[in-house]
């Protein structure tokens, strides 16, 4: 299990986005049930966003504020990661001192200063602000105690190196799943391993494609309708990966796993304790199903069989920068 800023987080984290980034946010009673279940089963890394709401951008943080006020014993048990510095109106990330200062102030005030921001990261890399300036600004907030450590979201290899030269990077969030293995080709996974930086894998279930719940084009369109963001899988992605998904379902059945359990177990095996998947859930049943992968880790042979399946049924990135660096498989929880 990875340590982030000397905090031992469970092998699987919890993404909170889907609780509020929807036309019909999950009611508090159900949301709190999901959060408490996850925490009681070792999911201590929680991923939140300053802008994770449709009608109310601060809905995600407001949910957390209500949760921690109702369950104060959970405050010190949760490692809270927050994305910020994103303008939901322009869909732009701003890594300037002015915007970061405003963002961190907003997050702390919305949380009512009940819970410290354990890890803060801009929601993406701002192409218009030198990353060295952004990191230097964030370091000042670490020094002042407003945030405890700094992360990066979807950086390139060069951006990681530049940021790392300014300040210690505690974690890096990337898009990673069985269907999206870009970090194995572009050097990010290898560099983070070399620098001992844990990776946090968002969308480990490929926006529903690896849960078995998304089976038709209509399901894709329904996701787009109710979750208004550009991260939902396009129809072209679904059609091109359908043969792969069917093959993975067969492997999951062979291993006595659900497709979601296979998807998360693959990441745990590929990361060997250095990649933390953060699935999200909109119901108690879904989070319960996801956490079944705690006890179902792929052995070396099974992991190799999954990799072979992926290589046969799923094309690699169009222009990979390197050969895939896929290692993994273990007989016990890492």
Curated annotation (Swiss-Prot):
Keyword Oxidoreductase: yes
Pfam families, alphabetized: Aldo_ket_red
The keyword tRNA-binding appears for this protein: no
Transmembrane segments: none
Polar residues bias spans: 320-334
One GO cellular component term: cytoplasm
Catalytic activity, EC: 1.-.-.-
Catalytic residues (positions): 52
Keywords in alphabetical order: Cytoplasm, Nucleus, Oxidoreductase
Main location class: cytoplasm
Protein localization: Cytoplasm; Nucleus
Chain spans, region Disordered: 314-334
Any one GO MF annotation of this record: aldo-keto reductase (NADPH) activity
Coiled-coil positions: none
Family as reported in the entry's similarity comment: Belongs to the aldo/keto reductase family.
PANTHER family: AFLATOXIN B1 ALDEHYDE REDUCTASE, PYRIDOXAL REDUCTASE-RELATED
Protein name: Uncharacterized oxidoreductase C3A11.11c
Organism: Schizosaccharomyces pombe (strain 972 / ATCC 24843)
Lineage: Eukaryota, Fungi, Dikarya, Ascomycota, Taphrinomycotina
């Amino acid at each position: 299990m990875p340590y982030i800023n000397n905090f031992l987080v469970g092998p699987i984290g919890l993404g909170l986005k889907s609780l509020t980034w929807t036309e019909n946010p999950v009611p508090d009673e159900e949301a709190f049930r999901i959060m408490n279940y996850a925490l009681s089963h070792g999911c201590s890394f929680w991923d939140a966003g300053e802008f994770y709401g449709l009608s109310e951008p601060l809905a995600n943080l407001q949910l957390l504020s209500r949760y921690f006020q109702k369950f104060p014993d959970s405050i010190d048990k949760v490692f809270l990661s927050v994305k910020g510095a994103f303008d939901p109106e322009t869909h732009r990330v701003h890594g300037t001192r002015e915007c970061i200062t405003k963002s961190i102030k907003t997050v702390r005030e919305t949380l009512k200063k009940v819970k410290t921001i354990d890890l803060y990261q801009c929601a993406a890399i701002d192409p218009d602000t030198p990353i060295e300036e952004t990191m230097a600004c964030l370091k000042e907030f670490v020094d002042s105690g407003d945030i405890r450590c700094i992360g990066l979201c979807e950086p390139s290899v060069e951006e990681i190196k530049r940021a790392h030269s300014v300040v210690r990077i505690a974690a890096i969030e990337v898009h990673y799943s069985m269907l999206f293995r870009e970090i194995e080709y572009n050097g990010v996974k290898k560099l983070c391993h070399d620098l001992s930086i844990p990776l946090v894998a968002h969308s480990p279930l490929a926006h529903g494609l690896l849960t078995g719940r998304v089976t038709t084009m209509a399901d894709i369109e329904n996701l787009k309708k109710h979750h208004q963001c550009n991260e939902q899988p396009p129809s072209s992605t679904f059609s091109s990966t359908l043969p792969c998904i069917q093959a993975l379902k067969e492997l999951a059945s062979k291993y006595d796993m659900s497709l979601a359990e296979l998807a998360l177990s693959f990441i745990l095996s590929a990361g060997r304790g250095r990649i933390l998947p953060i699935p999200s859930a909109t119901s108690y049943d879904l989070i319960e199903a996801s956490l079944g992968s705690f006890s179902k880790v792929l052995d070396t042979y099974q992991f190799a069989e999954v990799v072979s399946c992926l290589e046969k049924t799923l094309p690699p990135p169009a222009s990979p920068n390197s050969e895939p660096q896929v290692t993994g498989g273990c007989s016990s929880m890492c």
